Amino acid sequence: MKRVLLVCLSLMAFCLSARSQPVRKPVYDVAAYLYPAYAADDPRLRPFWPSGIGEWETVLTMQQRNPGHYWDRKPLWGPVNEADPAVMEKEIDQAADHGINVFIFDWYWYDGRPFMETTLTNGFLKAPNRSRMQFYLMWANHDVVNVWDTRISTLPEHNVIWTGKIDRDEFEKICLRNIELFFKQPEYYKIDGKPVFMIYDVKNFIEGLGGVKQAAAAVRWFRRQVRKAGFPGLELQFTMWGPNLNYSGFDAGKTDRPREALVRKIGFNSSSHYQFAHFIPMDDEYPHIVDQAVAEWERIDHDFTLPYYPHISIGWDNSPRIVKSPRVRNNTPENFEAALRRARAWVDAHPGLHPLITVNSWNEWTETSYLQPDNVYGYGYLEALKRVFVDEP
């Protein structure tokens, strides 16, 4: 009888102990792209924005250049210099408090040297609270055309000011520099211990290096250098665009996954999107756009065995740069919150996937896809993030 009583008491104690244990909250890596053009200490920005405040010039002069235009957005924090560590300290706190734990820095290299890098090197890396935020690089290796300079952005021309294509020697220079300067930072984002590096324009990458075979050889070299630096490997991502990744007939190969065959041959490990505008018509209602995005995630999941990390964009309207632009309608904070929930559910439904979600963006003001507070929705988008990834279990 005593033994039975002891067993019963033990079971009761176990049940009470189990009941008192808090439910472990799922952990997500919510990564917001950060566009580094809002800096005041980079002289290479002045040819595009001569006033010396970076692309804030485009934001603040919109009505002056186009009186009565519907686009009249204003930053609640003002036209801050994001290359100032004091400014970045406040932005890191705001981002982290609202559920963002990774910044993906748009990173540029033109004419043999970095471009728009001071937001990262002078701002983020010198911020006293940088340990609250991880970061990684998305190499924005697209060509630079007229679009940044509003004095010429509406002209019917396609002038390539700088090309994003680079050869093998330049690629090696970039990789070695990034390994030493960024990958070795304690805050650099890693998956399974491997530094993550994303390439935006796969076509430019291939063409600059001389072809698919040469690009693959360059990636193998890059991986060796990363391992020599003490890491277990490299997590190389590519930016997914539309459904067609054909390059010089490569997709005609005899395989049931031709697009994956291309990116695997080069050596990529995973992908995400940068913007809904890259694969969905933008002149539409936001909920319908999100439906199409989720359908695209499912298509990618079917067509690729490589991991895909779901992406949510806040909106799209490029009119500050080009005056007339397709624009997303009804992209309210409430609808954005619903989109975030779908991304979270998609990650939950793929338990083998690293829980990474990318968001466009922290500060793409001139594309009207930003989390930072403004005169229209205030802190609405940030509060939506907080409800989904901080407040809820």
Predicted regions and their residues:
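Positively charged n-region of N-terminal signal peptides that target proteins for export
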Residues: 1-4
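Bacterial N-terminal signal peptides
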Residues: 6-15
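Sec/Tat signal peptide C-region and signal peptidase I cleavage site
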Residues: 16-20
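Glycan-processing catalytic domains of CAZymes
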Residues: 21-393
